[in-house]
């Protein structure tokens, strides 16, 4: 609380202060008796509001329950919204929360329900930096969705341990390389290009050619695109 009060004193009454708060560490699930619980988090959030905080940003988990912080694909959207909603009931300031938000429609439903005031997202924006723009412009179907495959988490951890590399994304090859791979040069001038095969490689080739202003024809012998990606999407809980 002293830190919050010092920030307020140094930055003034108009400066917004947000506090990230764990709603629960879920340690009872791994046999550890002591840890942050929802009841304790509610008391902390109330104290933060009294100290002058403008927003509570609710997360969860700890090192021992890492899957509740960065959830793999088996976790459903909104699975821990109830925790943030309980915290919000005790406050008058806005509450943001993480809870595996993938689809704009689900985000709208969540905000419309009044459970929280803001959705907090991370990996979805790594997968598609234009997530928000596409959602607002009615292009939700064009969003490149996070798979929940944890590859960004794995590569970020490796980079921290070795001092080399950076977080990478299974569906966004430009992540961390934005200054290296800028927008493709528009040198197609309407010339015709044919791509044979509508698997992941063919689709990416067709996309880049189209961005380069080629007149692209994509040919696929099957009645669906995606190649082997279609088969990999069939098991439950796949992105």
Feature annotation, model-predicted:
Residues 227-228:
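Radical SAM [4Fe-4S] cluster-binding motif and immediate context
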Residues 1-196, 200-211, 215-216, 224:
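Flavin-dependent oxidoreductase catalytic cores
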Residues 143, 147-148, 231-239:
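N-terminal glycine-rich dinucleotide-binding loop that anchors FAD/FMN and/or NAD(P) in oxidoreductases
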